[in-house]
Design a protein with these regions (language model features):
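Short amphipathic alpha-helical segments and their helix-coil junctions
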Residues: 7-16, 69-86
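Residue-level detector of well-ordered alpha-helical segments, enriched
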Residues: 26, 30, 53, 72, ...
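Core of compact, soluble alpha-helical bundle domains
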Residues: 2-67
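Short, compact, well-ordered microdomains
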Residues: 75-109
């Protein structure tokens, strides 16, 4: 099993706790899109307690990657923080929740 597959298995397990019917193919694409950041223990997590990090997710992911407005991005990030209550929030799972919430799965098609 590759390092990527090991990480993906961890993210799949975390996502199944939130949504038993989750789209694992989409999670795989979101994870692939994050590149080498998933291998760094600091960058592969999201801290909902840090406003600057949430702003960065909104700007770099919601607005630039998914192409939504700042307001839509802010709402989706807040919704993901509410839904994903684990202390250590895996970035791929967090981004997956945002993508699904905004209905932007087509970005990864």
């Amino acid at each position: 099993m590759s390092k990527f597959d090991e990480k993906l298995a961890t993210y799949e397990a975390a996502l199944k706790k939130l949504d038993a019917d989750a789209d694992m193919a989409l999670l795989r694409k979101v994870t692939k899109g994050l590149g080498p950041s998933i291998y760094n223990n600091d960058s592969n997590k999201v801290a909902c307690s840090q406003k600057t990090e949430l702003d960065r997710v909104n700007t770099n992911y919601c607005q630039k990657k998914l192409g939504v407005s700042a307001e839509e991005g802010e709402r989706a990030v807040a919704a993901a923080c509410e839904k994903y209550t684990e202390r250590a929030k895996h970035r791929p799972v967090f981004y997956y929740l945002i993508c699904k919430d905004l209905g932007k799965e087509s970005v990864y098609a």
